[in-house]
A protein has these predicted regions:
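Short acidic-hydrophobic, aromatic-tinged amphipathic segments that line or gate anion-handling sites
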Residues: 36-39
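Structural motif
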Residues: 1-4, 48, 107-108
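Short, charged, surface-exposed secondary-structure boundary motifs
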Residues: 14-18
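Metallo-beta-lactamase
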Residues: 19-22, 26, 43, 50-55, ...
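Single conserved hydrophobic/aromatic residue that forms the stacking wall/gate
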Residues: 1-13
Length: 136
């Protein structure tokens, strides 16, 4: 390629990197508010299933997990991951709260529940009790 062609492409890339709509840089996130506020111990019925609500703050202030007793599984969102935990470095996160939520709420569930995080592979609470380096 000719030097001028390369320079022109570099300038185009530079301009695109400055555009937040193209480069996927986080824009300021506007707050939003829940339509319904759930509390620890609430029951939610959806699609013929009954979920128990566990208040599991830490990743967010109002974080909850949903326990499906009949299937021995829990939907943990971004609280717990396979061998990891959710981020707490945002202004609304708390490392102390997320550790407490995992140890005192999730790990308090009796039995080997399957834990489904918001993303990434599923795990089990027994595996995380034994091997998660963040909550030993």
């Amino acid at each position: 390629l000719h030097l001028c062609d390369r320079r022109q492409r570099q300038m185009c890339i530079r301009d695109r990197l400055r555009d937040k709509d193209i480069n996927l840089t986080f824009r300021k996130i506007e707050p939003f508010y829940a339509d319904v506020k759930l509390k620890d111990g609430d029951t939610v019925r959806e699609a013929g299933l009954e979920f128990n609500v566990l208040f599991t703050p830490g990743h967010t202030v109002g974080g909850v997990s949903y326990v499906l007793e009949e299937k021995k599984c829990v939907f943990v969102g971004d609280t717990l991951f396979r061998r990891s935990i959710g981020r707490t470095d945002f202004s609304y996160g708390s490392y102390e709260d997320i550790i407490s939520s995992i140890k005192n709420k999730l790990f308090a569930l009796e039995g080997n529940y399957i834990a489904y995080p918001g993303h990434g592979p599923a795990t089990t609470l027994d595996e995380e009790r034994a091997a998660n380096p963040y909550v030993r």
